[in-house]
């Protein structure tokens, strides 16, 4: 009787256990930590070129001049915890130095920035086991569109938001408190939408929208928790500052970028595993329904 009760208690957890096993097997087989390390290395190599290209695009549009300053502050405050101010100062110096580069050097910066997008594309298609390859021209067009239209769309959305916030009817106390709550969860929403687009658009196979939304939500929540946990770790255990001194920002930045890519790839693995788990359950049900006839 006790064993029967235990079975009834554990039976609702069985799907979760099965899914967890499938997810762990997939993560282990794909070598998630190695893929994250590869992307972290490429990200650090491409970070300055990518930021240079993005803010050069903002500089080309006068309407984005003020927004680019706000966007910088928003990115470093919400996506680079603990050492955002220091990293921002260094990156702004690097970007200022890159403005004196020649045409050949500028082309090299653009190619290096595109290298990061290509690496993300390759890694995600490895996770999805996709053998379909885009043509070189189509791939370049997609990468260039992401590199150029992405920042412009973000800037346009911030321009619209700033305009709406400046309207007089929003000065009401209740509306102000509502806006504060929305702004508090805004980084989470941006992460969720960004991850959803990443998991939906980048793979060369069809990805169910529901699976991509679930995987993106898990990744966004882990990313927000990771920011707080990482900031707490740097504050409470300042071992990097004690060992490296002024240069501590380098390993701290690398560690954060690596941790971020682990979260992004975990969300991708969850998205893929959801589809595989559903297919396996469908196959098991079809076998059970066919067995009495045999």
Swiss-Prot record:
GO cellular component entries: plasma membrane
Predominant cellular place of this UniProt entry's protein: membrane
Compartments where found: Cell inner membrane
InterPro entries in the record: UPF0761_bac, Virul_fac_BrkB
Membrane topology per record: Multi-pass membrane protein
Domain of life per record: Bacteria
This protein's name: UPF0761 membrane protein YpsIP31758_0030
Organism: Yersinia pseudotuberculosis serotype O:1b (strain IP 31758)
Top-level taxonomy: Bacteria, Pseudomonadati, Pseudomonadota, Gammaproteobacteria, Enterobacterales
């Amino acid at each position: 009787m006790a064993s029967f009760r235990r079975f009834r208690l554990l039976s609702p957890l069985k799907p979760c256990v099965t899914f967890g096993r499938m997810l762990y097997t997939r993560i282990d087989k794909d070598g998630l930590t190695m893929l994250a390390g590869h992307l972290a290395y490429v990200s650090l190599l491409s970070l300055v070129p990518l930021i240079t290209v993005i803010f050069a695009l903002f500089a080309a549009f006068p309407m984005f001049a003020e927004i680019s300053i706000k966007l910088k502050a928003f990115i470093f405050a919400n996506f680079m915890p603990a050492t955002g101010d220091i990293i921002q100062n260094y990156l702004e110096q690097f970007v200022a130095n890159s403005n004196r580069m020649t045409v050949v050097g500028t082309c090299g910066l653009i190619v290096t920035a595109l290298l990061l997008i290509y690496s993300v594309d390759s890694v995600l298609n490895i996770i999805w086991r996709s053998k379909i390859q885009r043509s070189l021209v189509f791939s370049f067009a997609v990468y260039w569109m992401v590199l150029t239209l992405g920042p412009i769309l973000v800037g346009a959305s911030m321009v619209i938001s700033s305009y709406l916030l400046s309207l007089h009817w929003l000065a009401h106390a209740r509306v102000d408190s509502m806006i504060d709550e929305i702004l508090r969860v805004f980084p989470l929403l941006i992460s969720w939408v960004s991850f959803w687009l990443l998991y939906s658009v980048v793979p060369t196979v069809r990805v169910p929208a529901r699976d991509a939304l679930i995987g993106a939500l898990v990744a966004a929540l882990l990313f927000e928790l990771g920011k707080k946990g990482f900031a707490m770790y740097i504050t409470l255990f300042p071992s990097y500052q004690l060992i490296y001194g002024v240069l501590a920002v380098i390993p701290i930045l690398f560690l954060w970028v690596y941790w971020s890519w682990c979260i992004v790839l975990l969300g991708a693995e969850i998205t893929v595993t959801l589809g595989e788990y559903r297919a396996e359950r469908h196959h098991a049900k079809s076998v059970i329904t066919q067995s009495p006839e045999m």
